[in-house]
């Protein structure tokens, strides 16, 4: 073991803290030896007797490379003292003491054994990258440590993260700092030409660095497309320099060639994504060219889609990239931005948990037993909006039900992939199309072998893969097809099926995509190439795409875009599949134009109508629910609210005011409209058209709401009519505010009545509207006695002139009341 690594200075402190406590944070810059030296120096600690070290690396390439370095120091190969586990690949033996794993592997191990009984120390390497799985795994490990394994040690290692902040969240865990080893770096700032692409700008600065400096060059570009374009530009110059690409999708042997010195000792250029920022050691690098950009996945809450976004690097990322130039000796870093703008860069990268799609995290939490994420201790808590959207997706995939993981959800976790892809594979297994499902899943997980210019149809990729398997000619990228076949083979092994080498139904891929992305089933939306998805969003195919003539498609890959997404990968879809597999849904609604109930059976994909048929025997309860909603919207004017019903409302309202102790229904219009279920439901069973509302007798309906004892009180205290001296029963006109009801009666019919009539047990006098024989108003009074005495004599004079055939006695108190016309006595 080499003793010139800076990490050696703090190894005693790390050993001491891990012996006395169970959690420690180590801050050490890249190149200090924390990944490749420290684990070996901890193996003899007493708490690791009979236990292993589990070290988490964020990337597969880094996991392999770290394991090889550990093995080399012991004169071994991976699988002996040190081993690794990555997706679809494992090099671990019975004597392995240090296991280097990628993040998804650790999560799976925790789910299989919550207490991690075989392990004494968990190391989180490169934690500053703040990947989603690292945050989740740390939260789960912390809970396992607190509840099941207080003896389990956790070591969090970071190059740039704020150790004090992590310490506080991890229970004030000790922070140990290694100064590292960094040679001086000269910074050269070069203006970015906005008229050129990132690849053009980067290649220009690389050529400048070749002329100005000696040594190998590491250039950072955002994505694999930028790398390929930059490589094409450099290769056209015919440089006597080896040019290597380095990104995650490349074959392992190509990646290793980029890490090692050139066999013939030639100078080399490595064009890399952010994969080379930390754990990987690339021999001979003295010059770094930083494009200033990185490409990161971002989840759009509003669209529900994840898209890759090219963003400016943060200060901590720029510093890490520059640090690669100063590991072996003094170096140079070319930055493609002005020096004055460097301090304006965002200080730190955002944790992935804040911007990622969280369905896999939520499924893991549900399987752990904590769908409520707040019950775990997080370095950065996941956003509630993203959690809600993930829960909704998992419910659509039948992975969650009523907040619990389902049998289907547990089956999804058996596949080391996103829940959508796992659901696709399960669908293929259930429908006996596992081989094609394996191919579709592999194509979705790997890079596109044809490129976007070939169009969006995934069947073209399936054909290319089939041709490649049959050793037939294909224009597709053979390296990508090889990787795709490797992944497909892993899925076929797990599903126990053979490879697909023959053509399949054109819509089969669409069925599989629809299973994984049910909300992205899409129907052409009036304009060729424009599709409306089941979730209501809109996406477009590129002009001249082979799928343009398809009415229905299922979309696997698209960019969220600003208003309309761009479709990158899709397949034709037969919507009758949904009719065959689903029972459809009964829909009952009110047709405003025709004023009638419409009942149909519909088959839908989300918001998209596939087909519908008339429903012969609709559910009456559902009809009543729709009608009640119509009443809420349209109001009481739907009904024939005649005077008799109106007066009942006013009588009840008045009595409620006069006697609040009497329990009576609330018949105010606002209350009736707000809660039609309470009074209208029993009478709506036969209503189908707007005219049917007018046929309902509101007086009878309202009367039925009043219990018999209260009805008796209503008739007694607030009668509908009262008798007058003539023997007539005269209706009262009640007011909803409880004021005096009006008794509109001809004057002659109350001759002989000395005082104003009353109701409500004599407590409420009526308001008399005294009328002429022609029912014209003569006088309004609430004091009949005063009227007879003071006003009647004058009124009599006028009435005798106007109504000469009628009798108008001088003494109204003793006069006989008259119903009809009575001949006037000459003296009267």
Question: PLM features: residue spans?
Answer:
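Charge-dense polyanion-binding interfaces
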Residues: 123-124, 249-255, 427-449, 744-770
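Short, isolated positions in well-ordered beta-strands
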Residues: 183, 539, 729-731
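Charged, non-catalytic accessory extensions
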Residues: 534, 597-599, 604-828
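Short, solvent-exposed cationic patches
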Residues: 323, 554-574, 744-767
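P-loop NTPase motor module signature
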Residues: 1-424, 559, 737, 748
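A short, compositionally biased
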Residues: 171, 524-527, 715-718
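Second RecA-like catalytic domain
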Residues: 233, 239-240, 245, 257, ...
């Amino acid at each position: 073991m080499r003793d010139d690594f800076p990490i050696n200075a703090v190894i005693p402190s790390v050993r001491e803290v891990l012996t006395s406590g169970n959690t420690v944070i180590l801050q050490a810059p890249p190149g200090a030896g924390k990944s490749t030296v420290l684990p070996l120096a901890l193996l003899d600690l007493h708490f690791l007797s009979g236990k292993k070290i589990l070290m988490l690396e964020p990337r597969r390439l880094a996991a392999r490379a770290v394991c090889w370095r550990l093995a080399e120091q012991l004169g071994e190969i991976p699988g002996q003292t040190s081993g690794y586990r990555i997706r679809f690949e494992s090099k671990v033996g019975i004597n392995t003491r240090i296991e280097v794993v990628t993040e998804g592997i650790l999560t799976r191990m925790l789910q299989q054994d919550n207490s991690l009984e075989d392990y004494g120390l968990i190391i989180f390497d490169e934690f500053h990258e703040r990947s989603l799985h690292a945050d989740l795994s740390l939260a789960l490990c912390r809970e396992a440590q607190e509840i099941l394994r207080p003896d389990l040690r956790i070591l969090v290692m970071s190059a740039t993260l704020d150790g004090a902040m992590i310490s506080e969240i991890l229970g004030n865990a000790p922070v140990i700092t290694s100064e590292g080893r960094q040679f001086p770096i000269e910074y050269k700032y070069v203006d970015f030409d906005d008229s050129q692409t990132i690849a053009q700008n980067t290649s220009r600065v690389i050529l400048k660095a070749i002329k100005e400096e000696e040594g190998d060059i590491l250039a950072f570009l955002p994505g694999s497309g930028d790398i390929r374009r930059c490589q094409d530009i450099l290769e056209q110059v015919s440089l006597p320099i080896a040019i290597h690409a380095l990104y995650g999708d490349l074959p392992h042997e190509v990646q290793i060639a980029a890490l090692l010195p050139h066999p013939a000792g030639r100078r080399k250029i490595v064009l890399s994504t952010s994969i080379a920022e930390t754990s990987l050691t690339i021999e001979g690098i003295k010059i770094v060219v930083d494009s200033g950009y990185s490409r990161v996945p971002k989840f759009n809450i509003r669209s529900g889609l994840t898209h890759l976004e090219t963003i400016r690097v943060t200060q901590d990322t720029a510093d890490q990239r520059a640090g690669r130039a100063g590991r072996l000796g003094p170096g140079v870093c070319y930055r493609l931005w002005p020096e004055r703008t460097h301090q304006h860069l965002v200080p730190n990268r955002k944790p992935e948990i804040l911007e990622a799609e969280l369905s896999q995290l939520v499924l893991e939490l549900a399987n752990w037993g904590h769908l409520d994420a707040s019950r775990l201790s997080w370095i950065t808590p996941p956003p509630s909006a993203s959690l809600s959207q993930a829960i909704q997706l998992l419910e659509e995939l039948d992975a969650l039900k009523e907040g619990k993981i389902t049998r289907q959800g547990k089956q999804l976790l058996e596949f080391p992939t996103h829940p959508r892809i796992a659901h696709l594979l399960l669908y293929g297994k259930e429908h006996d199309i596992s081989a094609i499902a394996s191919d579709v899943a592999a194509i979705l997980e790997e890079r596109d072998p044809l490129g976007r210019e070939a169009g969006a149809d995934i069947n073209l990729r399936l054909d290319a893969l089939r041709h490649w398997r049959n050793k037939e000619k294909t224009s597709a990228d053979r390296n990508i097809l090889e990787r795709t076949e490797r992944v497909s083979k892993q899925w076929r092994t797990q599903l126990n099926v053979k490879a697909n080498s023959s053509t399949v139904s054109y819509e089969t891929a669409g069925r599989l995509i629809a299973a994984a992305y049910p909300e992205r089933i899409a129907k052409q939306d009036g304009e060729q190439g424009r599709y409306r998805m089941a979730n209501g969003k809109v996406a477009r195919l590129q002009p001249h795409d082979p799928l343009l003539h398809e009415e229905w498609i299922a979309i696997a890959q698209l960019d969220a875009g600003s208003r309309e997404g761009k479709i990158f990968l899709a397949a034709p879809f037969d919507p009758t599949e949904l009719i065959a597999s689903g029972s459809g849904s009964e829909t009952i609604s009110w047709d405003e134009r025709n004023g009638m109930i419409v009942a149909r059976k519909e088959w839908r994909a989300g918001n998209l109508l596939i087909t519908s048929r008339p429903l012969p025997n609709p559910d009456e309860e559902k009809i009543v629910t729709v009608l009640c909603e119509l009443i809420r919207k349209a109001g009481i004017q739907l009904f024939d609210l005649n005077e008799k019903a109106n007066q009942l409302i006013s009588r009840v309202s008045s009595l409620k005011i006069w006697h609040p102790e009497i329990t009576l229904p609330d018949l105010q219009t606002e209350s009736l409209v707000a809660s039609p279920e309470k009074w209208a439901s029993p009478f709506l069973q036969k209503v189908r058209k707007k005219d049917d509302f007018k046929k309902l007798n509101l007086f009878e309906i309202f009367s039925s709401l009043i219990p018999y004892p209260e009805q008796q009180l209503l008739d007694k205290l607030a009668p509908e009519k009262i008798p007058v001296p003539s023997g007539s029963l005269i209706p009262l006109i009640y007011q909803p505010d409880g004021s005096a009801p009006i008794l509109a009666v001809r004057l002659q019919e109350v001759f002989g009545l000395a005082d104003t009539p009353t109701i409500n047990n004599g407590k409420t006098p009526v308001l008399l509207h005294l009328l002429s024989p022609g029912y014209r108003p003569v006088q309004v009074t609430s004091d009949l006695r005063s009227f007879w005495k003071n006003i009647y004599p004058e009124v009599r004079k006028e009435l005798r002139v106007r109504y000469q055939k009628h009798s108008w006695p001088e003494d109204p108190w003793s006069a006989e009341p008259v119903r009809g016309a009575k001949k006037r006595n000459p003296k009267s």
